[in-house]
Amino acid sequence: MYNFDGKIKNCIRSAGPLGNIKDQPIESILVENNLSRQQQIVEQQPVATCHTCYDLERGKRGFDHISDRVFYIRELKSIPVDTYQVGNFDLRTVDVRWTNLCNFACVYCGPEFSSKWSDELKIRHQTPTEQQTTDFKNYIYDHAGQLRHVYLAGGEPLLMKENLTLLEKLNPNVNIRINTNLSKVDTRVFEAVCKFPNVHWTVSVETLAEEFEYIRHGGSWLDFLDNLAIIKQLGHKISFNMLHFLLNYNSVFDCVDFLKAQGFHNNSFVIGALLTPEYLNIRHLPKNVLNSVKNKLQDRINHKPGYLLEDSYRNMLHYIDTPFEKNISLSIDKLTELDQRRGIDSRNIFKNFYKDIDHGQTI
């Protein structure tokens, strides 16, 4: 995985980078810096930076659960075994975030993954030199024809011109997974993606209507619905990537029900707890409110929806029960600060949230 600041990681979930192209060429990072992790994997030892996936897999059997590690095991199962020898490297999958270009500033995002956030906070990033970036691009483009899987994310990948060049160089039978806010379908990148048969759209959404437009700042709910209808006609696979946190503790369920009513299967939903920023963590909610959420989750689990949806519910329930030091006052202060900067009043949008907070603090 490559981020526009130059960091190279095994994948987006990895807890630490392998290196940075500002310091050494990509070829050196992928071979020399990766030897110890390759050795651990070959010897079937747990890799310290992979704990996020191990935690999700703990106590579960089979492959019907959410884990990037399991996803790539399935996705690259046809790769020759000798590829996985220590010291050997053969690029077969990429996750390249060329820039942080994005037209949204989602409340839980930040400058690293959104140029709109960078502009709002007036942050300038230290990025690789033009030559370092060119060398990296050439490495990816030169190996594009042998890739089996390509993950396009961002930022907003449908806005990145580099993705157009990459798509033009890919094998037509490659598997493409694209994580998008689905705000723009009138781009050349979108047109190029539509030409591929094996596309998996991972659409970011976790609530409805005016809550959607607050959380996904810069977005339009009606545009989202129109664009969802467009990709639904393509015959591609569609999943929904959802985060569960302070503001959508109840409305995430309404979002799931709404999308299911549009005909989407229970295996289309990947829901996880928001980890950062911490002030939006769902566990800040008063105990009585969390108990209500837990009851709702347990009720939905009891109906045995199966597939990734049930696994999501179980993960959400487990996360709520993990120890946490509450500070709802800080959460409110941060939301007030955000509202003032953006000229919005969250109290007019999340009325039940503020009502539950006020009630929870008095009992």
Regions found by a protein language model. Give the residues of each.
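Non-transmembrane alpha-helical segments in soluble domains
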Residues: 27, 106, 164-168, 228-229, ...
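Helicase-associated low-complexity regulatory tails and linkers flanking the ATPase motor
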Residues: 128-140, 166
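N-terminal pre-core extensions flanking Radical SAM catalytic domains
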Residues: 1-12, 16-19, 23-129, 141-144, ...
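N-terminal cationic-hydrophobic initiation segments that often serve targeting/anchoring roles
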Residues: 141-144, 167, 171, 193-194, ...
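Residues that form generic nucleotide/phosphate-binding pockets
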Residues: 29, 139, 143, 192, ...
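Conserved C-terminal portion of the radical SAM core fold
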Residues: 177, 197-202, 222-362
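Distinct, well-ordered alpha-helical segments
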Residues: 162-168, 187-193, 251-255
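Core AdoMet radical
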Residues: 91-101, 112-132, 145-160, 171-186, ...
